[in-house]
């Protein structure tokens, strides 16, 4: 016996299926479903009169001991990831994703990958989008409240440095020395997100660098405010090669110790993460952008210049002055700030992101960037580039999957690969920590509906606690049980160096969180950056600052209007 229904009826019950497209927020981007894991007519849905009931889609015999019985199922979700746009159920067990497929009761249903039992809870995601928790790899740890703001935007991992509101932290993403690193590892016990800290990379004595790696730093930051000399950079890379950690570089804006070519000569063929590669955030003026052409450079850019708008240049001078402890009464300080703000390279930045030449996007939080806007600004850039450059190869009307996969990789899998944590986070794949963000498509990229952290709901839009229903106004983000008691430590990870992990840093500091080592970093190249591995020839005109890709000038127009803006923030 069969039953037929219209496409609209099916979508209203179970969400979109193969060939259907979903508009992302109010952007011009459409995600088209490539595959649906459901068996039509046997979809598992929860609620009164629905199929997830005892003896139906819920198996009455199984116990949690069965490896295929889920603790949590996210049902009928549209998964948008760097490698897929699919409709599926997600099975979560012990805080980790264990399957992506079809959930239900194998006794009466076909092709069941995930068993729903009496020990299984359900998050109904029909008509909703699911993405991996975002990863921000350029965080100045200035204010603990950054974690909550980021979490409510869909970011679940922070990497960077700092010790609070010190001048060093405001400027340089550095947690310097074993004492500070240990204190920040202890402070992370109270944060609702995954974290990893970078130490200070300036020292000619390798012991001063090694002791920071041994203390738990996941890498070193070489920053011009501490002196980004070729010598300091080379010594830091030597230590990184020995201990399999990453080097993040904020290069020498003033070209005091050498030019871009001197920096690259010091780097040789060794891998590093180049921060804000366009240069407005800092780095060799005016041609740091050329470093993105090198196969050993993993380039990111930060959100204050993304996307390029008619306000971008004007707001940056004051931001540079404050962030880098400059004095407006000193002409040299003004000149330093001016040298970093070039509308020509800023206008090229969006295009390089769209071409996959720049591989990542991060915040530069409270040091010119906005910690809660990484995801929003990423999709604004994607919208603007489709508007100006048209569809990417392989995309067509109501199908922007190639562009969508490129852009989501910039704040999920590529940052995870770059910093050696892709075994744990960065995508919706079996074996990874269940850091998952649920979106209503209308609010995609702006305001998540809820955030699952380590398999438990961590933050969600919810109503007044005294309301008769969960949607009683005011509806706002509220802490969920993932942020209370022992769950604060049992659902999040702290990343450390392999040597610190092997030497028992968790026991030495009595850390309760899941402590995991970074790994597989030093053999990386840009070819490992998913959907963002282009290495064209880049040139910058030293007089006009115009940017050329393989001899062709690239630029973009300053936006005067953007999606994902005012209509979402009226209240």
From Swiss-Prot:
Q: Which domain of life is it from?
A: Bacteria
- Binding annotation for Ni(2+) 2: 221, 250, 276
One Pfam entry name = Amidohydro_1
Q: Which residues form the active site?
A: 324
Q: What is its EC number?
A: 3.5.1.5
Q: Which reaction does it catalyse?
A: urea + 2 H2O + H(+) = hydrogencarbonate + 2 NH4(+)
Quaternary structure note: Heterotrimer of UreA (gamma), UreB (beta) and UreC (alpha) subunits. Three heterotrimers associate to form the active enzyme.
**Assigned protein family:** Belongs to the metallo-dependent hydrolases superfamily. Urease alpha subunit family.
**Name this protein carries in UniProt:** Urease subunit alpha
What organism is this sequence from?
Answer: Staphylococcus aureus (strain MRSA252)
Organism lineage reads as: Bacteria, Bacillati, Bacillota, Bacilli, Bacillales
Which gene does this sequence derive from?
ureC
